[in-house]
Amino acid sequence: MIKINTIQHYLSMSGIRITVSDVSSAAAKVQELHHLPALTAVIVGKILAGTSVLATDFKNHEGISILWQTNSILGSIHTDAYEGYFIRGYVDTADDNLPVTSHNEKLLISDKAQLTVTRYSLVRTPYSSRINLSFGNISECLGPVSYTHLRAHETEADL
């Protein structure tokens, strides 16, 4: 069972690792603070969850920031997760009360969009990686971002 406001890790007997993030209270707070309509709140909540999962791969008080530059009315979506406990996020502009559908989500977040992921560390210079997005949902767009991808700049001496 998933606990509210937690990040949980599971490891199968065959070595498959699964990370589950529940950021429902944080997403609800973002919606309340920024007066977001439902579709925008869903989008920001999903990106908050993805950001928190990506941040759990790090140690030593590292953090991660996502800048999701859309080509839509939303403008840019900003999310941060750090130290494994703290998340925050906001969007430049909310949608015009569009119905919550996967099609509308894809229209707002991924048509000619750009995803910038920045990893912050206390001991290293921040590292940013940029991905051009095509047409997909949030999980499909965050799929290319992985532990290996975010650590690609490190050399063997760093590890």
Task: Show where each model-derived region lies.
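Hydrophobic transmembrane signal anchors and adjacent membrane-proximal interface regions, especially
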Residues: 51, 115, 131-133, 149
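Conserved small/polar residues in nucleotide/adenosyl-binding loops
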Residues: 148-155
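Long, charged interaction segments in nuclear RNA/chromatin-associated proteins
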Residues: 137-143
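Flexible, glycine/proline-enriched loop segments at strand-loop-helix junctions
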Residues: 35-38, 125-137
